[in-house]
Amino acid sequence: RGIEYRREPVEYLDVMFDGKPLPAMFSKAPGDGPKPCILHFDGLDLMKEIIYAAVADEFRRRGISLLIVDHPGVGGALRLHNITSGPDPERPAAACIDYLETRADVDPNRIGIMALSLGGYYAPRAAAFEKRLKCCVAWGAIFDYGVAAADRLTGKGGEPSVPAYAEHLHWVFGTKTQDELL
């Protein structure tokens, strides 16, 4: 609601992925013509509205549009559509790029990806397999989530970021046992 009250230039939309909607926000860079665009994926316990509040103005000031997506395992994709995270973040990234390529206000030759925390693993993997991505920013990457999750579950990894951490991980990844999760 705060975005509505501030009258910010954002468009709420769904990007279709495997026949299901990934909730997203598109923040258009000012000016005419196609602009570069960053696709933003979240971490384990974030959602698009938090990222929008943190970075959208900075991208707009630099003439870069931003597509922030609740990708599989995150935010509305998980809570509203039960889309769990999989081992192949390049697939939802490809769906997002397919969508961006339909927009006249996006330069299809200047699409990049950025993500933080667990998303810092997703973004490089997506960029490695999805050749249409021209840049990649891994913001606080977790390169082996199995080790990080095991440490947190056994109390060695610091405080969990969400209550009922083990249950949250099972929900995000669609697993039932710790062996499946790790």
Which residue ranges define each predicted feature?
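N-terminal cap/lid segment of alpha/beta-hydrolase-fold proteins
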Residues: G2-P36
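Active-site glycine-rich loops that stabilize anionic/oxyanionic intermediates
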Residues: K35, H40-M47
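The serine-hydrolase catalytic nucleophile loop
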Residues: L44-D57, H71
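Conserved alpha/beta-hydrolase
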Residues: F59-G76
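Residue in the alpha/beta-hydrolase core beta-strand immediately N-terminal to the catalytic nucleophile
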Residues: D70, R110-G112, C135-V137
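Hydrolase active-site cap/lid region
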Residues: A128-L182
